[in-house]
Amino acid sequence: MDLEATTEETMHEIVKLHPVWPWLNQVKGIGPQTASLMLGYLLSPREDKGPSSWYKAAGLYVIQTDKGESRLPRYDHLEKGEKATWHPRIRRNLYVVGTSLMKAKGFYYDFYTEVKDALKIKHPDWKGRTHSVAFWKMIKLFLAHCYEAWAEAEGIKAREPYPIEILGHRKIARPH
């Protein structure tokens, strides 16, 4: 067996011991390798934190530009000498997760298409931007569910997701 195969096999055995693996294993599009990529960079849930702490770490928070536009932070928009406030590997790995969720065409893909269709109607001038916005909203929903499942698996009473706790929404899309 070559080094790559041995490494993957070891990675699969380790991720299956992770507290959130039973939940992740039910998500269409998430396998041991994809889960390992993601879980290797995420901190364990805490009672005083919510999934928004993961959003911040991945740079999935919205900023306002000088032109009044909303967007996610990007390296090519940093001022000279300014440091990123997010971890680029987390975002890259979440992009891989999102691509896998899209290819699997499960619950999260359905959510993505609903959001994208709504954005096309609400913002017909956005053209290619609707994919990006819907994609990262899908990732954030997945992260909220993952955070909740992981906290529950460890017996932690995690905070409610931001849309419920702060914005006063009554429900959030659930996968199962």
Question: Can you say where each PLM-predicted feature lies in the sequence?
Answer:
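Charged, low-complexity, helix-prone segments enriched in Lys/Glu/Asp/Gln
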Residues: 3-8, 12, 101-104, 115, ...
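Phosphate-backbone recognition surface of nucleic-acid-processing proteins
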Residues: 23, 37-131, 136, 145, ...
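Amphipathic alpha-helical surface "interface" segments used
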Residues: 115-121, 160-175
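Basic, amphipathic alpha-helical segments enriched in Lys/Arg and hydrophobic/aromatic residues
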Residues: 126-162, 171-174
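Helix-hairpin-helix/helix-loop-helix acidic hairpins
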Residues: 1-33
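Catalytic phosphate/metal-binding cores of nucleic-acid and nucleotide-processing enzymes, i.e., regions
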Residues: 5-17, 62-64, 71-76, 158-168
